[in-house]
Amino acid sequence: QIARIKGAEKVLGIAGTDEKCAWLVDELGFDAAINYSTEDVKGRLRTLCPKGIDLYFDNVGGMLLDVCLGQLALRGRVVLCGAISTYNSPQRSAGPSNYRNLITKRGRMEGFIILDYSDHFAEAQFEIAGWVADGRIKHREHIVDGLEHAPDALNLLFTGGNTGKVIVRI
């Protein structure tokens, strides 16, 4: 949604269920969504982005990062903010196998954590609150009742069982 607000011509999403993909397209206004559980992600990206991916925001890592690096456009960018697919892996994950595309496509890949931009929090909160208030940003909350259910709520993040921000109501 922010990409669209900031001028992106085409916005695609990748999610793990048909329901989440429909939400991305029907409610959030994405141009298309790919279900990584049931679709050929690489093939769909080739169809939807015939010139490659200009910008990929990654919170997942693993196979999805690999596939997207393989579909990078000339001077494409990859922003890394998470790697949730690897967090519970018993072994250390290897780097992406398509990293050479960063060289051949003259791409850039950079990681960050939200605290890197703490000096911009107030400004961002003001701007995003305005977008929410005027309906340009939509969101869902997945509310779990009771502190005793907090571990289950946290696990939803790793299994994809949530739709929206997970909140534990006490």
Language model features by range: what are they?
Residues 21, 42, 65-66, 151:
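Short, well-ordered alpha-helical microsegments
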Residues 40-51:
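Short amphipathic alpha-helix with an adjacent loop that forms part of the alpha/beta core around
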Residues 136-143, 151-170:
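C-terminal capping/lid region of NAD(P)-dependent oxidoreductase domains
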Residues 31-37, 142-149:
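Short acidic-hydrophobic, aromatic-tinged amphipathic segments that line or gate anion-handling sites
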Residues 34, 54-57:
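N-terminal Rossmann-like NAD(P) cofactor-binding module of classical short-chain dehydrogenase/reductase
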Residues 8, 24-25, 63-137, 170:
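Glycine-rich phosphate-binding loop and adjacent beta-alpha segment
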Residues 30, 52-53:
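Local beta-strand N-terminus motif with an aromatic residue
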Residues 1-38:
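Mid-domain Rossmann-like dinucleotide-binding core that forms the NAD(H)/NADP(H) cofactor-binding site
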